[in-house]
Amino acid sequence: MSTIMQKIKEIEDEMAKTQKNKATSHHLGLLKAKLAKLRRDLLAPPTKGGGGGAGEGFDVTKSGDSRVGLVGFPSVGKSTLLNKLTGTFSEVASYEFTTLTCIPGVITYRGAKIQLLDLPGIIEGAKDGKGRGRQVISTARTCNCILIVLDAIKPITHKRLIEKELEGFGIRLNKEPPNLTFRKKDKGGINLTSTVAVTHLDLDTVKAICGEYRMHNADITLRYDATADDLIDVIEGSRIYMPCIYAVNKIDSITLEELEILDKLPHYCPVSAHLEWNLDGLLDKIWEYLDLTRIYTKPKAMNPDYDDPVILSSKKRTVEDFCIRIHKDMLKQFKYALVWGSSAKHKPQRVGKEHELEDEDVVQIVKKI
């Protein structure tokens, strides 16, 4: 592992010394590809027969409808924030793991059970194998949203460091997957086409990056001005794209003018965990970023159950998804569904499995006789 870390440092040093311009883009693209491969090797799970790797003992059972991971440096008030949120809205449970205390709490908010998970151990250099970063980030990758807790006194410094660590683990915050296609083929070399003007990538750079992965035949289509990093992300194929909120804590220690600036920044939510300022606003933002859909069930000849909604992701909210969420065998008996709500053209509307539901729709499943 020390050899891999040494190679990573050498490449990072070379990249830092290399000026970014058109003449060096080919070389930098090649270095970035080498770096991505080394980090992948570094963060790979230990092979069997190693006498018990550092990854043993860290696992948190996923519960609830969605999971939010709290990340932050020590003494930024992360634990206080977690305790205030869970203490106000639900009970908090704690579980001890090997050399690491992880405190998951579940809150019920707008009918959804949301697991808040404290992820300790995010330190500078964690992406390079220091501490227990690999184990912590493997859990972070299972989250539906990341909540980075920052100190209002030095928010930008901590923000950049944490983002760098998460980026190194293949987690992309508040980004969409690269809008490009990469199709491997048996022969014909590397072909690059684009539907827009391209300023970051040329054919030589693309060939160099593909060559590092021993790919010499592929068709690549760019639908936006993609970078070398974007191409590498697609080739690596193990990137996680998730929403992120920056909870700036201890706002009682800054001026009103500074607070107004923070409040205007995208994805930021100023709070004071100690004084319980704007915790409702933070929960609203978490709900917005999780983008969940609540569906109420209605048994035949009975009123809808508004107390215990079925929670779906906004990306998977068809009637079929709804049935699977309730029970995997429900589809075998499915005949049609009756839907009341904003997705229905009339009330009720008879629909099939492919119908897309909207938040707070009411659904009655009609089974085969």
Swiss-Prot record:
Instruction: Report the residue ranges that make up the OBG-type G domain in this protein.
Output: 66-291
UniProt organism field: Arabidopsis thaliana (Mouse-ear cress)
List positions binding GTP: 72-79, 118-122, 249-252
Q: Which UniProt keywords apply?
A: GTP-binding, Nucleotide-binding
Domain spans labelled TGS: 291-367
What is the role of this chain? Binds GDP and GTP, and has low GTPase activity in vitro.
InterPro entries, alphabetized: Beta-grasp_dom_sf (IPR012675), DRG (IPR045001), G_OBG (IPR031167), GTP-bd (IPR006073), GTP-binding_2 (IPR031662), GTP1-OBG_CS (IPR006074), P-loop_NTPase (IPR027417), Small_GTP-bd (IPR005225)
Protein name, per record: Developmentally-regulated G-protein 3
Entry keyword annotation includes GTP-binding: yes
Give the record's family classification.
Belongs to the TRAFAC class OBG-HflX-like GTPase superfamily. OBG GTPase family.
Q: Give the encoding gene's name.
A: DRG3
Q: Which GO terms describe its molecular function?
A: GDP binding; GTP binding; GTPase activity
